[in-house]
C-alpha cells in the first residue's frame, strides 16, 4: 500500500500532526465522502459563491488537497491552534496550501461546509502523550520581519571601484542609444513605487513630488530647497551598482517623448545644486538604477508642462541640489532612496524632453557635475544611470545634439574635459554625466533653465571646482578611502530563526528503555575479562608483563582448555603449552613490551635468548606440546582437521610462518622459538603460545600482512599445509602473497623460499617458510620445528588459528577468549597483541619490527636466534632475519594468515577452512593486528576450529 488510507477519519487524526511536520510532503488526499457518494464523477460546484474567483478549479475527483472555501473556515476553526506549529501553520496554511486561494476564513461554513464531510479538520489531534516525540530537532524557520541585511558594514565601507576597461576612451565620443527598455518600467503615474517605509526619506515629499504637476517641476519638492541638492549629492555617494544608483538618483528614465527626452537629462544641469547633486551621485556607488531611484526622481510621465521643469526642478535652486546631494548620501537600494526622493520621473511630453536633456548643457555647473561624474567609478552605464538621467533614445534631431551638446559651451567643455578624465566608454561617461548631452544648442535654447541657469551654473561650477580641488586632489586618494560619509546602518538584530523546543528532549525511547544493555558479568572462569585486563594493562604498562605472564600461563591452559573440549591431547598440550606459554608469555610480554618500546626489544631479546635456552628445553615439551598443541590447535584451528592434515604442513606452516623461526628455531628455535617465540610471544615456553604469540606476532604481523597472507597463507597454509611440502607451490602462491610476507618471514628463513614463497615458485621452499624452514625446520625443526611447528603450528595454528581465526574470530574470542591464547595471544597478542602491538610492532611494524616482530619472532627468533640465529638463523637466521623481517612481516602475515591458515590451514589444513578463516582472517588478519592484540590468540585456539571452520 503506497499510502495509508489517510483520508479516513481514524487515520486523519493520527497522521495529521505528523504529516504537517514531515520533511516530505505526503500527497494528502482528502475525500469528501458525501461528494464521492453523491456525484462522484461530477465536478463539485464551487462551494462558496462569495469567492467565485477563488473557487477551486474543479474537484472533478472527490479529492482535494484542502477543504474548499467553506471548509477552510472550518479548518481554521477545527484546527484552531492545534498543538504546536501545525496548528498555527494550519490556519494560515490551509488556504494557502489548497490550490484555491481561499482566505483562511472564507466565511462561515457554507452549505458544502465540512459539516457533512469527514475531513481532517474535524479531528483534533489526540491530546494524549502519543508515541514519544521524535528526537529529531524541530527546526522551524522563523523569518524575522526585518529584511535580511545583505551587505556587511565592511562591504559598505569599502566598495569596489570599477576599474576602467581597456579601450574605454571617454574622450572619444561614442554615439549612444540607450534602449528605452533599459530603464525600469515607469511606475504608475504619481504613484511612487513602494519602498520600505524606513527607506522613505520623505514619503510625503515623494508623493508631492510625483504628483506635483507644475511646481519647480516634477521634482518640485526636491527642487524646493537646498535639501534636495544635498540629497542628491548624497545619493551619488551612495554605493551600489549603477542601476541601483540611478534609480537611486530617482530619475528612472523612462522613455520620454522625443522632445522631452532632451530636457529630461537637462534638468540636473539647471543649477549648481543639481550639479553638486550629480557630482555626489557620481560618487555614489551602486547600480545606476539604484542611485537614480535614490535621487528619487523616478520619472513618471508628467504632463508636458511639468516635464520640463521636472528635471529642472532640482536645478531650481541650490536647495534642490543640496537635497539631491543628501539623497546621494542616503544609503539603500536606489528604488528605496528614489522613492525616498520621491521624484519618480515619468516620461515627459516631447516639448519638455528637450529641456530635460538640455539642462546639463546649460552651464558649467553641469560640467562640474560631469567632471565629478567622471570621477565616479563604474561602468558608464552605471554612472550615467547613477546620474540618474537614463538616456533614452532621442529623436534624430536631438540625437545630433546629444552628441553635440558638449560642444555647446565652456561648461560643456569642462564637462567633457572631465569626462575624459572619467574612465569608461564615452557612452558610459556621458550617461554618467547624466546629461545625455543633447545638443547644447538645443539644450540651451530649449531649456527653461538656459538663461538664468547660466549664471547659477557658473557660480556653481566655481564652487564645485574649489570643492573638487580641495577635496579630491587625486583619484587615488579617493579610490582607497573608506566611504566615511555613509551613515552607519543600524544593525538589525535578526530574530533567531531557530526556536528550540521548550521542553528538553528526552533521548530515551520506549524501545531503548526496554532493552537496556547489561554489562556482561565476568565469571570466575571467564578468562576473557582477565585476559583483556591483562592486555589492556599490557598496552598501558608494557613492563608489567611478568605477573600477567604468569596468569597467562594459567590462562593459556584455560584457553587451551577451551579447545580442550576438542581434544584431550590438547589439554595435555595445553598444560605443557601453559607452562611453555607461561615462559613464553613472559617472553611474549617482553616482546609485547618491546613492541611498546624498542628499548624493551633489547630486553626482549635478552629474555628471548634466555628463554630460548629455556625454550630449548621447553621446545621439547613444546614439541610435544607443539604437536599436541598442533592438534589442539588444529582442533582449534580447523583445529584437528586442519592440523592433522595440515599438521605436517601445519607444523611446516607454522614453520613456515615460523618457518623462519622454526627452522633454526625448531631446534634452537624450538627453544628459540620458545625463546624466540617467547621472545616473540611468550615464545618458547608456550611455543604454541609462543608461537601463538609468535605466530601471533606473525599473525599479527600477518595480521596486517595476514590479510593477504592469511588468505594466501590460508591457501598457502591450507595448500601449504596440505601441500605444504607438496603444495608448496600452491601454498607458495597462496603463500606467495602470503609468503611474500610470510615468505619474507620465511623468506629469511628460506630466502629462496621467501622468494618462492613470495612467488609460489619455490613452492617447496616457499612452501612456507616451512618449505625451507620446514625443510630445515622440518628437518631440524621438522621434529622440533614440526613439533615446534606443530607446537607452533599448534601454537601458531592455535595461535594463528587462534590468532588468525582467533585473530579474526579468535580475535573475537581472543578478545573474549584469550584465556590462554588470550594469554599467549593475550600476551602474545599482547606480546603479539603487542606483537601485534609489540610483535606486530615488532612484527606489526614487523617488517621493520618483524625483524623485531620476528624480533619477537625472528628477533626473538632472530635475536633469540640471534644467538640462536646461528642455527635458526640458518634458515631463519639469515632468512629469518632477512625474510623474517620482510617475511616475517609477511610471515607474520603468513603466520597470521599462514598461521591463521597455518593454524587454520595447517590446522584444518584449513586450506579451505583456513582460507575462509584466512579470509576471515584475511580481513581478520588485518583485524587481527587490531583485534588480535586485544584478544589473545590462544583463546581463539579453542574456538579456532569453529572459527576457522566457521569463519568462512
UniProtKB/Swiss-Prot annotation:
Residues 116-139 are annotated as: Mn 1. Keywords: Calmodulin-binding, Cell projection, Cytoplasm, Cytoplasmic vesicle, Cytoskeleton, Golgi apparatus, Lipoprotein, Membrane, Microtubule, Palmitate, Phosphoprotein, Repeat, Transport. Interacts with calmodulin (via C-terminus); the interaction is dependent on Ca(2+). Interacts (via C-terminus) with TMEM106B (via N-terminus). Interacts with ZDHHC13 (via ANK repeats). Interacts with ZDHHC17 (via ANK repeats). Residues 37-457, 486-952 are annotated as: Disordered. Involved in microtubule stabilization in many cell types, including neuronal cells. Specifically has microtubule cold stabilizing activity. Involved in dendrite morphogenesis and maintenance by regulating lysosomal trafficking via its interaction with TMEM106B. Regulates KIF5A-mediated axonal cargo transport. Regulates axonal growth during neuron polarization. InterPro entries: MAP6. Palmitoylated. Probably depalmitoylated by ABHD17A, ABHD17B and ABHD17C. During neuronal polarization, palmitoylation and depalmitoylation cycles regulate MAP6 shuttling between secretory vesicles and microtubules, and its polarized distribution in the axon. It is found in: Cytoplasm, Cytoskeleton; Golgi apparatus; Cell projection, Axon; Cell projection, Dendrite. The gene is Map6. Mc- repeats lie at residues 222-267, 268-313, 314-359, 360-405, 406-451. One of its GO terms (cellular component) is microtubule. Isoform 1 is specifically expressed in adult brain. Isoform 2 is predominantly expressed in embryonic brain; expression persists at low levels in the adult brain. The modification Phosphoserine is found at residues 98, 185, 207, 590, 681, 736, 951. Belongs to the STOP family. This is Microtubule-associated protein 6. Residues 151-174 are annotated as: Mn 2. Residues 222-451 are annotated as: 5 X approximate tandem repeat Mc.
Amino acid at each position: 500500500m503506497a499510502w495509508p488510507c489517510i483520508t479516513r477519519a481514524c487515520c486523519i487524526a493520527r497522521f495529521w500532526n505528523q504529516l504537517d511536520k514531515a520533511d516530505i510532503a505526503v500527497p494528502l488526499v482528502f475525500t469528501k465522502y458525501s461528494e464521492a457518494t453523491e456525484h462522484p464523477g461530477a465536478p463539485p460546484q464551487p462551494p462558496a459563491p462569495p469567492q467565485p474567483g477563488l473557487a477551486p478549479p474543479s474537484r472533478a475527483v472527490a479529492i482535494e488537497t484542502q477543504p474548499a472555501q467553506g471548509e477552510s473556515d472550518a479548518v481554521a476553526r477545527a484546527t484552531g491552534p492545534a498543538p504546536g506549529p501545525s496548528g498555527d501553520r494550519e490556519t494560515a496554511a490551509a488556504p494557502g496550501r489548497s490550490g484555491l486561494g481561499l482566505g483562511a476564513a472564507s466565511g462561515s461554513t457554507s452549505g458544502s461546509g465540512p459539516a457533512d464531510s469527514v475531513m481532517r479538520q474535524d479531528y483534533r489531534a489526540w491530546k494524549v502523550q502519543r508515541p514519544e516525540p521524535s528526537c529529531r530537532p524541530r527546526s522551524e524557520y522563523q523569518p524575522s520581519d526585518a529584511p535580511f541585511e545583505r551587505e556587511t558594514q565592511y562591504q559598505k565601507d569599502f566598495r569596489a571601484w570599477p576599474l576602467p576597461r581597456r579601450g574605454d576612451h571617454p574622450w572619444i565620443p561614442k554615439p549612444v542609444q540607450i534602449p528605452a527598455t533599459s530603464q525600469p518600467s515607469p511606475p504608475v503615474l504619481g504613484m511612487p513605487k513602494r519602498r520600505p517605509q524606513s527607506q522613505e526619506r520623505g514619503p510625503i515629499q515623494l508623493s508631492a513630488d510625483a504628483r506635483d504637476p507644475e511646481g519647480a517641476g516634477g521634482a518640485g519638492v526636491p527642487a524646493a530647497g537646498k535639501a534636495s541638492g544635498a540629497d542628491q549629492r548624497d545619493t551619488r555617494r551612495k554605493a551600489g551598482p549603477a542601476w541601483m544608483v540611478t534609480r537611486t538618483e530617482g530619475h528612472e528614465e523612462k522613455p520620454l517623448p522625443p522632445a522631452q527626452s532632451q530636457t529630461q537629462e537637462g534638468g540636473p544641469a539647471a543649477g549648481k545644486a543639481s550639479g553638486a547633486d550629480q557630482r555626489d551621485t557620481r560618487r555614489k556607488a551602486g547600480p545606476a538604477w539604484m542611485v537614480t531611484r535614490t535621487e528619487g526622481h523616478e520619472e513618471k510621465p508628467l504632463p508636458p508642462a511639468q516635464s520640463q521643469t521636472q528635471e529642472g526642478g532640482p536645478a531650481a535652486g541650490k536647495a534642490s541640489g543640496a537635497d539631491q546631494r543628501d539623497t546621494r548620501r542616503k544609503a539603500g537600494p536606489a528604488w528605496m532612496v528614489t522613492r525616498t526622493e520621491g521624484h519618480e520621473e515619468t516620461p515627459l511630453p516631447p516639448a519638455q524632453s528637450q529641456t530635460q536633456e538640455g539642462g546639463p548643457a546649460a552651464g558649467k555647473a553641469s560640467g562640474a557635475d560631469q567632471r565629478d561624474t567622471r570621477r565616479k567609478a563604474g561602468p558608464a552605464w552605471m554612472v550615467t544611470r547613477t546620474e540618474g538621467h537614463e538616456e533614452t533614445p532621442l529623436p534624430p534631431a536631438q540625437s545630433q545634439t546629444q552628441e553635440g551638446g558638449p560642444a555647446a559651451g565652456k561648461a560643456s567643455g569642462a564637462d567633457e574635459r572631465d569626462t575624459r578624465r572619467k574612465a569608461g566608454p564615452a557612452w558610459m561617461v556621458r550617461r554618467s554625466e547624466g546629461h545625455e548631452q543633447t545638443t547644447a544648442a538645443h539644450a540651451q535654447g530649449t531649456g527653461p533653465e538656459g538663461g538664468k541657469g547660466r549664471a547659477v551654473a557658473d557660480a556653481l561650477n566655481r564652487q564645485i571646482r574649489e570643492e573638487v580641488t580641495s577635496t579630491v586632489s587625486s583619484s587615488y586618494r579617493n579610490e582607497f578611502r573608506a566611504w566615511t560619509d555613509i551613515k552607519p546602518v543600524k544593525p538589525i538584530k535578526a530574530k533567531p530563526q531557530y526556536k528550540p523546543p521548550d521542553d528538553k528532549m528526552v533521548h530515551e525511547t520506549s524501545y531503548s528503555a526496554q532493552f537496556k544493555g547489561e554489562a556482561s558479568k565476568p565469571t570466575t572462569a571467564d578468562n576473557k575479562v582477565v585476559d583483556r585486563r591483562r592486555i589492556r594493562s599490557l598496552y598501558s604498562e608494557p613492563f608489567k608483563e611478568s605477573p600477567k605472564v604468569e596468569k597467562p600461563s594459567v590462562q593459556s591452559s584455560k584457553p587451551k582448555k577451551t579447545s580442550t573440549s576438542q581434544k584431550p591431547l590438547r589439554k595435555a598440550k595445553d598444560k605443557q603449552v601453559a607452562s611453555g606459554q607461561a615462559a613464553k608469555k613472559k617472553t611474549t610480554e617482553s616482546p609485547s613490551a618491546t613492541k611498546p618500546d624498542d628499548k624493551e626489544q633489547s630486553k626482549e631479546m635478552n629474555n628471548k635468548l634466555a628463554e630460548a635456552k629455556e625454550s630449548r628445553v621447553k621446545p621439547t615439551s613444546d614439541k610435544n606440546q607443539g604437536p599436541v598443541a598442533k592438534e589442539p590447535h588444529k582442533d582449534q584451528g580447523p583445529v584437528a582437521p586442519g592440523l592433522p592434515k595440515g599438521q605436517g604442513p601445519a607444523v611446516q606452516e607454522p614453520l613456515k610462518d615460523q618457518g623462519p623461526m622454526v627452522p633454526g628455531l625448531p631446534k634452537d628455535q624450538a627453544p628459540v622459538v620458545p625463546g624466540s617465540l617467547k621472545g616473540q610471544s611468550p615464545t618458547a615456553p608456550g611455543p604454541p603460545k609462543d608461537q601463538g604469540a609468535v605466530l601471533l606476532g606473525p599473525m599479527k604481523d600477518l595480521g596486517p600482512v595476514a590479510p593477504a597472507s592469511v588468505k594466501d597463507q590460508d591457501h598457502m597454509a591450507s595448500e601449504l599445509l596440505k601441500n605444504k611440502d607438496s603444495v608448496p607451490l600452491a601454498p607458495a602462491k597462496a603463500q606467495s602473497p602470503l609468503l611474500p610476507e610470510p615468505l619474507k618471514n620465511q623468506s629469511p628463513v628460506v630466502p629462496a623460499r621467501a622468494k618462492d614463497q613470495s612467488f609460489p615458485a619455490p613452492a617447496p621452499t616457499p612452501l612456507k617458510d616451512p618449505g625451507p624452514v620446514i625443510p630445515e625446520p622440518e628437518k631440524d625443526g621438522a621434529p622440533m620445528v614440526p613439533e615446534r611447528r606443530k607446537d607452533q603450528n599448534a601454537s601458531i595454528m592455535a595461535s594463528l588459528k587462534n590468532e588468525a581465526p582467533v585473530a579474526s574470530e579468535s580475535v573475537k574470542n581472543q578478545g573474549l577468549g584469550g584465556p590462554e591464547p588470550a594469554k599467549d595471544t593475550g600476551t602474545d597478542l599482547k606480546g603479539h597483541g603487542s606483537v601485534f602491538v609489540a610483535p606486530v610492532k615488532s612484527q606489526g611494524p614487523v617488517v621493520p619490527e618483524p625483524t623485531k616482530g620476528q624480533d619477537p619472532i625472528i628477533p626473538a627468533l632472530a635475536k633469540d636466534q640471534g644467538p640462536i640465529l646461528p642455527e635458526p638463523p640458518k634458515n631463519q637466521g639469515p632468512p629469518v632475519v632477512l625474510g623474517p623481517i620482510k617475511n616475517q612481516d609477511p610471515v607474520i602475515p603468513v603466520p597470521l594468515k599462514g598461521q591463521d591458515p597455518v593454524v587454520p590451514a595447517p590446522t584444518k589444513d584449513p586450506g579451505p577452512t583456513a582460507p575462509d578463516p584466512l579470509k576471515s582472517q584475511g580481513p581478520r588478519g588485518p583485524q587481527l593486528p587490531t583485534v588480535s592484540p586485544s584478544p589473545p590468540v590462544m583463546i581463539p585456539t579453542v574456538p579456532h576450529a569453529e572459527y576457522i571452520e566457521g569463519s568462512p
